[in-house]
Structure formats: structure tokens, C-alpha cells
Amino acid sequence: MILTLAYFMLGTLLLGVFAEDTVSQIGINDSLWYPYDEALVLKPLPNNDLLLSFAFQLQSEPFDPAVSSMSYDAYEHYTTFPRAIPPLLESTATRQFHLRFTRGFWDALSWGQLPHAGKEAGASGVELWSQVQAMDQEQAFHNWKKLSNSLSGLFCSSLNFIDESRTTFPRRSYASDIGAPLFNSTEKLYLMRASLPNEPICTENLTPFIKLLPTRGKSGLTSLLDGHKLFDSLWNSISLDIATICSEDEDALCHYEMDARIEMVTHVPSALARGERPIPKPLDGNTLRCDTDKPFDSYQCFPLPEPSQTHFKLSQLFARPINNGNLFANRPTRICAEVDRSTWTAFLSVDDTIFSTHDNCFDLSNDQNEGGSGYDFILESTDTTKVTPIVPVPIHVSRSLTGNGQDRGGMRIVFHNDNDTPVKLIYFESLPWFMRVYLSSLQITSTTSPQLQENDIILDKYYLQAADRKRPGHLEFTMLIPANTDIVMTYQFDKALLQFAEYPPDANHGFEIDAAVITVLSLESSSSLYEMRTSTLLLSLSTPDFSMPYNVIILTSTIMGLIFGMLYNLMVKRMVTVEEADKITLQSGLKYKLLKLKEKFLGKKKTKTD
């Protein structure tokens, strides 16, 4: 026993010495880093707005698509890639999917184009599209439904409400820049898309998103992400893109790539004011921004334009600094500022030390943050009106409902091209089944070029009629908008009646209509250049009086109570005259019983006295 214990202690000591020597030999250039990149880009916008773009890129370990995870020789190894994603992709035969959570309004006139040419943003609410491998469309929809249900539980959203009445199969829209592999040559890839325009976006969707990242909100850029700050912005978008990439080598190994992004636009003075005054209260007179040229006794305060000078820290916007960089990635955390260098200056603050670079990009090295106080990013400007050039959108599109009846209505779409060159685009629209569109009522007019005809504008037309409760209306046009021209497209539709159980709890509020998707194409190669969405619409349908059943129940109960009372009285009571009733009352009342009791008592007392 003593000898065994001695051998054990000696082995432990040797193992500790070997481990200590091994750890001391591990350097920063060793092969223990993992494929994970994170970056933050800050871009000042006009009117003291600020665009913040968080980007996270991950890559899974290689795998052989010919080996199933259920086989005896299969193994799975995870590093930084989330473990919940690969089984989901394999069980649903999904080769790639794209998920968007978007809230707010993007001001294209002031802010220009969307980040990343609009390909990382979605429509208001929740939007999902994916490529699924299957034998036929029925099997593809089964896998699609399974995918949406799984993502619903993973991100705490209402994606489980996606059914066949909300799903469309785009023909030319939503084309991916990355080709999806086909693991079985006898099957095909099906592209499916669905949207929930009335889905509220909240912290319950952000928290699972952060948990997919390896830092999990504890370090790196994810330590900045807070639901209160993110959803208190003017516009925000959470995007998740996962694709299957296969090599063309002989081994034919594949891997998954995950691109997660968070974009937000915040108004800097408002964000700073919330930090200074968490509880709203009136401002002092000396802090009001008023025009002193106006009469001092005027009843109205004339606000001045936005302040042209600013100085703020990233910790003031998010109420916390960056908690170190990532400790395991093959590249350090990176922060960049896209600013006009003539009036803007960017600094990195580390342990009360300020750094600057020529390109306003900073790598967060953990060797610099020895004090452990975290990193802070500082932006200051002497003239906030000077920002980097705003790239205008290639085309402006607005959509609205027409008509005021409860049985029919119309749609009006305006395309405004203020460029000197024509714009080629794909107009995609998914309409609910209760909007019965009359394609024969489609009209194309132009206020600037009245001679234009429908064939001059619409190059290709695809329309799939909706089926009641089974399929939405699918409208997809390839259009060419001439230069410096306004095009108005209108069509009419009927409003179908819904069943009683199909109305939502807030039926009088209206029904949300999906946003239209516009994909701007290149005139030479027809490749996608820019993507944008219109705003969602609110359609009013004939709504029944839901209080009527309750009124009927109350009225019926009252009448039945009256009838039952009358019948009950006739059954248990006897009909007598008034005189007999008075006599019975005198002989059955409480006063009569007291008199009888008194007489009885006095009679007994008199008998005893005698």
C-alpha cells in the first residue's frame, strides 16, 4: 500500500514537471489558435447619428459528407463553432440558411446605402430563407418546417408559425453569392423563403445569438452587446448566415462557415443624455438649445441645429468598456473608424494610455491591457457635419395601399430613379392568401415619360396565384427603370373573409403585409449589386363584432332566468285569494308566533298560580 502510494506521488510529480515544461514551451505562434474573427466598425452619419457594425466569423472543423454522423466510425469535434448548428443542418438536409431580425426604419435619404450593399439586412420583423436538399418539393417543405421549428426554439422566436401559407419558392430573388453543394446527385436544392413582419424583436432573440459565439458575452466585442442599448437605437439588425463550403480537392472535405452580424444606428446626443439623466426631467434654462436671435419673451423655443462638436467614448454608449480581446482566435479583435480625417479623430484608451493609428484601426492585444481595466474607444470631432461620403441608393421605392372599402383594395408602388443610367431590378412580393390579386388590373404609368408602355418596363413576369390557406401569392417581376424617371405600378385585389378562429387577438389593429424585396442587378452580367426592402404595410379586413357572442350569452341567460323563475313559482307555490293570503300571513308571521308563544307562557304561569 505504501509502495503504491509512493509510485503515485512520484508519477504525479513527474507529470506536473512535464506539464509545466510543456506549458512554458507554448508560444503565441503555436497552433492552438482557432478560426474566429471579430471586428467592430464605427461610421459617423449625418445629424449626429452613428452606425456600429459588429461582425463575427466562425468556421467548423472539416467533415466528410459521405460519412453519416450515425455511422460507427463517425466522430464530431467542435472548437469555436456552435455545437447546436451542425446536427440541425444535417437532420434537415440544409446546405445554407439566412436568418434576419430587423427593427426600425433605415433613412436612405440621410444615411445612403445599407451596410454590405443591403445583403446582411432583412425586412422589418423576422425573415428566413434557406436552400434545402430533397427528392421533391414535399420532402423539401417537410425539412423546411423542421428547420423553422428548430430555429424557433433556438432563438426564442415565433418561427414555428411559418407554414405553407407563408412559404414561397423564389425564382431569381435571394440568389446566394456562394454556391451550395449537392451531396446526392439524385436530389435537388430547393430555395424557400418566409417572413413574419409583425414579430417583435427583443432581448430574448439577442441572448441566444450571443450564446452561439465562443466568447458568450464575457470577453471581446460581445461584452458590449446589451439588449437595452441595442434595441434603444433608431435601427438595428441581427443577421446569421451559415453556409456549407466544400473543397475541390480529392479528399472532398466540407466545412461550415458562420457569419454573424449586428448592425445598429444610434443618435449619439440622445444616447449620451440617457446616460447622464436616466430618469427624464426638465432641463435647466442654460442647457436649452435655443436661437438667441429670437425675442426672449417668445412663447416658443426655437431649437438650433445639432451640435457640430462632439467627444464621446464607446463606454458611454454601452455603459461598459470592452472586456479584453478574445484569447483563442488566430486574429486579434479589431476596431476601425470610418471617419473624415480632416475633422474626426479616433483613439484607443488602455489603462489611461491613449493610442492612435494612421488608418484609425486598432488591434486589441491582451498584452497591452495588463491592468485589466478593459479597452475604450474614443471619437471626437470639431465638425460633425463632415462625414465620409454618403453613397446614394441606386433607386428609391415606396409602396402603399389604396382604397377605403372592406371588400377590395389596391397596391401602389412608386419607383424613382434619379440616376443618369437605367436601373435593372427584380421586384419580389409575397402576399397573403386573403389578398386575391387581379393581375389583369396591373397598370404601369409614368409622370416623366408618358410614352412608356408596360412591355418597356417589365422584362419578365412571374405570378403564382395564392391558394386559400395553402399558398401565398408570389409576384416576381424583372424590371428596367429608365434614367431620371418615375414609374408607378398599380394593381387591384379583393379581400377574402377569414374564419372566426383565424383572426388574431388584435384583429382591429390590422394584418401585417410582408415587405417587398428589390434586388438591383448589373446591366452587363445581371449579378446582384444591391438589395433593399420596402416598409411593411397594415391591411384592414372586415372584422366581426367579437363582443356579439358575449351579448347573446348575457341576453339568453337573462331570459332563461326570468322564464325559469316564473315556472318555478307556478310549480312550488299555491294560488290563493288576497283575503286568504292576508289570513295566512297573520297566522304564519313572526309576530303571530311571538303572540302564541307569549299566550302559551302566560297560560302555564296562570295554571301554576291556581
UniProtKB/Swiss-Prot annotation:
GO terms for biological process: attachment of GPI anchor to protein; fungal-type cell wall organization; GPI anchor biosynthetic process. The chain crosses the membrane at residues 552-572. Residues 20-551 are lumenal. It comes from the Eukaryota. Glycans are attached at residue 184. Belongs to the PIGT family. Component of the GPI transamidase complex. Involved in transfer of GPI to proteins. The gene is GPI16. Residues 1-19 form the signal peptide. Present with 1680 molecules/cell in log phase SD medium. Residues 573-610 are cytoplasmic. This is GPI transamidase component GPI16.
